[in-house]
Amino acid sequence: MLNRRDLLKSASSGVGYLAFAALAHEQALAESKADGPLFPKKPHFEPRAKRVIFLSMRGAPSHVDMFDYKPQLIKDNGKPGKYGRGRGGKLLGSPWKFKQHGKSGLWISELLPEIATHADDICMLHGMHTDLPNHPQAQTMMHTGSSQFVRPSIGAWTLYGLGTNNADLPGFVALGAPNGNANHFGSSFLPAIFQGARFSGDSRRPGGNNRFARREQKPKIPNIANPKLDRELQRAQLDYVQSLNKAKLAREKHAPGVEGVIESLELGFRMQDTLPELMDTTGESKETLELYGIGSGGNDSFGKQCLLARRFAEAGVRFVELSHGNWDHHRNLTNDLSARCNEIDKPISGLLTDLKRRDMLKETLIVWAGEFGRTPHGQGEDGRDHNNKGYTTWMAGGGVKGGLGYGATDEHGYEAVEGKMHIHDWHATILHILGLDHEKLTYNHAGRDFRLTDVHGAVAKDILS
């Protein structure tokens, strides 16, 4: 058996190396596209949607000010509260008005007038709850199903279960991903090829005063091109490295880490052609840019993310996650929540409109969520504390009943009391909509089968269309 040094010597001389590299390239390309881990797989049953666009609101938006109308909270404004960690704060009725929208009559705050026009396409999940009211643990739980251990993210599980529809692009993309938090987009013990491809940059959105705002990034492509080597030399270099990787894989038989490296390197090379063109939005019409709120003030950053999400979905990417930060309003709720809602309202509305007019919404599951909600009582002069006991997320598009308000919190919006949906149930439902049985989507690691929902999870069948 050749060792690494022998293989290096045998393949590094002149014409022999180039011929060897060409053959290795043909074999690698055929394997990566025909039977590699990213090759499209059959779902467990007929899917209701083909792809997911996950709108991640980092910092925990206030559900009682945006989507969960509580007239009793307004009536009891200023009365002593009985909820939360301090259990002594005064109840704080929402300072914003709610109205019913669409034929369904869904209640949505005046903070989100554009999203409200899509009420009949939205399924509100008012009975959400999660384990802990701490940002890092709750965000990890929302992404991976575990607050304590490093596990694959929901995007990685989705790609592992279904593969991709475009072998020249990542099957899982994270746009505007904040610095750090790699496990939110990671593959953990799954092969590395299933981790999310993160696109970020150096620009910060102005405003905000906490870590959830400061780390938000505008999408860009890091290191997509090699300025020192032309394409032919890059290909030759890559083929040689891949030959070493394949030799190692042949010796070790089962080495998912090596398999992931092989696939990732091939994908990275192919992306040099496809990705820059996909992320170039200069060819979009003025009407489309305006639809997403691009060029109209504070919406540019998230508007571009939403537009790119549509382009990635259109190109066959299976799971796209968008990040928007600075929802942690312990103070200055009145000004900051209004600003954050203004930043997402038109872009999300534009995304829904654009998908619908392209006949893509019926095959795309849109998921909007923060890691938990906020308390019905105030904190300080003008803020709300963390609340994991009850909050709202919503879904729209393929597989869900539009215009439905599912579940409920108590009269003040503190605790889920009807249609309760834990994060495990939420994950099980998303996978079900994609045609995946959360109990059958497993991966053997360290002597046991793991899954996204661990030993929990029940599909919320009442919301399925």
Regions found by a protein language model. Give the residues of each.
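Ligand-binding pockets and gating/stacking loops
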Residues: 1-465
